[in-house]
Amino acid sequence: MAIGLVGRKCGMTRIFTDAGVSVPVTVIEVDPNRITQIKTLETDGYQAVQVTTGERRESRVTNAQKGHFAKAGVAAGRLVKEFRVTEAELEGREIGGTIGVDLFTVGQVVDVTGQSKGKGFQGGVKRWNFRTQDATHGNSVSHRVLGSTGQNQTPGRVFKGKKMAGHLGDERVTVQGLEIVSIDAERSVLVVKGAIPGATGGDVIVRPTIKA
């Protein structure tokens, strides 16, 4: 694992290359990630850097959280995340410090994790890309139903994992292999090629790609 950043999805746009090719990109705003805790093998059994970002009203912060943030000497954030790291990656990191967009470089490939948009209860056609049944030719009412879900007496049941209608979306999704096409250090913004999970305004985690 490696240190990453917690950011916020601002939306999508496009940029043009020197050859005039339109490239779809996603803009990610990265407020300074404040280090709230450094975990080590001696104290916690594993090595990690814990960060917080954004702001939260004091009335929405529990006493335990207040004590944790006060001990680190940082303002209370809207969330807390941690990144597993190696001994080398801990060098130069200290509690109360910050991590910004300078962690990455233009052209670097990253993985982005977010919470996908919730779609509610959906049928098999939308959820699993099932084909529809005939629109006519004697078919009525059953145009978008699943059809048969199994066999007869043997095995006499529907197998676990059978693709059926159900809740779609609102789950943790990671998109791998996205290239950073631009970094605006002044505005603390990352611009990555392609789409990332979640709705505009949602929190995302940007890490160096695991498939280097």
UniProtKB/Swiss-Prot annotation:
GO terms for molecular function: rRNA binding; structural constituent of ribosome. It comes from the Bacteria. GO terms for biological process: translation. PROSITE patterns: RIBOSOMAL_L3 (PS00474). The modification N5-methylglutamine is found at Q153. One of its GO terms (cellular component) is cytosolic large ribosomal subunit. Keywords: Methylation, Ribonucleoprotein, Ribosomal protein, RNA-binding, rRNA-binding. Pfam families: Ribosomal_L3 (PF00297). Methylated by PrmB. Part of the 50S ribosomal subunit. Forms a cluster with proteins L14 and L19. Belongs to the universal ribosomal protein uL3 family. One of the primary rRNA binding proteins, it binds directly near the 3'-end of the 23S rRNA, where it nucleates assembly of the 50S subunit. This is Large ribosomal subunit protein uL3. It comes from Acinetobacter baylyi (strain ATCC 33305 / BD413 / ADP1). The gene is rplC.
